[in-house]
């Protein structure tokens, strides 16, 4: 069975230069295991079938405008469902607001209650998504370790493999 890899949210925040709006949430213990991200537009509209909450949730201009139009009470209700988790879905590792969008204080309090980090970036949504997906694909890529020596024999590369300590380099 293939080994699965993870990356800490703390490392992602540092690498992507994200602002942690919920400073009281311990991001060092949160691990990201999926390379995909999700824009929760359908979830904000109340549709939670097939919701992959294990992904980083990204709020862009479209989602933010929708939340503003629906009002704060409705937004808090939907975001609580997203953040609280249930028997059908887990809590997301984090929610990222792009384009330096405004985050209401009540939403920050809700995120703190459920220990879901709210992060913010100045980057445009599509640019941020492309960057984070590329970075996660590298960090979470499958790996293979072998004991071996590479040689150049008459211009051809040769890999000699074997157990450690059997004299491959002799």
Could you tell me what each predicted segment is?
Residues 155-170:
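Glycine-rich phosphate-binding P-loop
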Residues 100-102, 142, 166:
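Residue-level recognition of alpha-helix initiation/capping sites
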Residues 2-88:
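Gly/Thr-rich phosphate-binding loop signature of adenosyl cofactor/nucleotide-binding cores
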Residues 91-96, 100-137:
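Charged, amphipathic alpha-helical linker segments immediately N-terminal to NTP-binding catalytic cores
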Residues 55-58, 93-96, 116-117, 157-159:
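Structural motif
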Residues 139-151:
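Pre-Walker A adenine-sensing motif
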Residues 136, 143, 160-161:
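Glycine/proline-rich, flexible active-site/cofactor-binding loop segments
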